[in-house]
């Protein structure tokens, strides 16, 4: 009798768990993407080489190619939703798009609101310095002085790093990277704090002979895809997608995209 009761109990529990799994899948963003046949990705152009516009106004970059590969793996169309970075999380939480692929750093503060996939690349914050200051500013510590103005992008980790490491300097924020770095090029600010890949690429172009790249990273920053909470199926798929493109040495997509956007800078001719 006891065995029958235990068996019945286990059956009820397993049935309940199975039903919960089915309900989770029905609510999953991944299921909805497959059903509608479209993946909607939010990003903000202007963050080289992750996302930017070419001379014809088309959005290109490392993140765009990752998004294309993701949509192809899902068997759906890709739609890019151009979104200002300071409101990009709010848009995700109000279901304006399915996922954020926009060079977003994993932070504990953001993680309280959204879930992150495993990192797809790791960067750090570095400094672009106006050349007129190169004799007086030899290390990042020298920049922590009230006589210096430092720029960063509003709401990004460059702003967080600037305020953390340069408490005595004046930190001024801007909506875009181009606005913030222009202040340094013009001499109105001494330095710009931003992600290392962007700063490296900028030095190969407009920053050459005008700026100094202090390329020792101030921070360790893993970048990841951002999705809404409560969606284990989507998160599982994303992590497996990342694992596949990183470990598949036949297709070698991860390495090819890294070479295309971070090593080879031919694409600069398309945006300048």
Regions found by a protein language model. Give the residues of each.
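Short helix-initiation/N-cap motifs at beta->coil->alpha
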Residues: 26, 79-90, 172-186, 221
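Beta->alpha turn/N-cap motifs
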Residues: 42-47, 81-86, 95, 99-107, ...
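Periplasmic-binding protein-like
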Residues: 122-129, 196, 200-243, 261-272
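A ligand-binding cleft/hinge motif common to bilobed small-molecule-binding domains
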Residues: 87, 104-112, 161-164, 182-186, ...
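Ligand-binding cleft/hinge of the Venus flytrap
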Residues: 52-53, 67-76, 139-144, 158-175, ...
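Extended ligand-binding regions for polar small-molecule ligands
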Residues: 20-24, 65-73, 131-133, 141-147, ...
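A conserved helix-loop-strand patch within extracytoplasmic ligand-binding domains
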Residues: 76-87, 104-164
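Extracytoplasmic small-molecule ligand-binding "clamshell" domains
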Residues: 20-103, 112, 250
């Amino acid at each position: 009798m006891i065995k029958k009761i235990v068996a019945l109990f286990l059956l009820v529990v397993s049935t309940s768990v199975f039903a919960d799994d089915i309900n989770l899948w029905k609510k999953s963003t991944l299921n909805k993407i497959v059903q509608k046949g479209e993946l909607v990705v939010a990003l903000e152009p202007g963050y080289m080489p992750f996302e930017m516009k070419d001379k014809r106004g088309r959005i290109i970059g490392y993140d765009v190619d990752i998004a294309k590969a993701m949509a192809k793996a899902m068997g759906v169309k890709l739609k890019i939703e151009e979104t200002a970075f300071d409101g990009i999380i709010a848009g995700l939480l109000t279901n304006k798009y399915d996922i954020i692929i926009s060079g977003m750093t994993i932070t504990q503060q953001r993680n309280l609101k959204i879930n992150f996939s495993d990192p797809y690349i790791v960067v750090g914050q570095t400094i672009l310095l106006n050349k007129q200051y190169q004799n007086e500013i030899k290390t990042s510590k020298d920049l922590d002085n009230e006589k210096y103005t430092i720029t960063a992008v509003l709401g990004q980790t460059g702003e967080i790093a600037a305020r953390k490491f340069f408490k005595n300097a004046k930190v001024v924020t801007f909506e875009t990277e181009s606005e913030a770095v222009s202040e340094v090029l013009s001499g109105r600010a001494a330095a710009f704090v931003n992600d290392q890949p962007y700063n490296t690429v900028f030095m190969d172009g407009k920053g050459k002979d005008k700026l100094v790249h202090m390329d020792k990273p101030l921070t360790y920053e893993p970048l990841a895809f951002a999705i809404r909470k409560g969606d284990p199926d989507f998160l599982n798929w994303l992590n497996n997608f990342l694992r596949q493109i990183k470990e598949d040495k036949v297709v070698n997509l991860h390495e090819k995209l890294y070479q295309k956007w971070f090593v080879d800078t031919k694409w600069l001719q398309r945006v300048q």
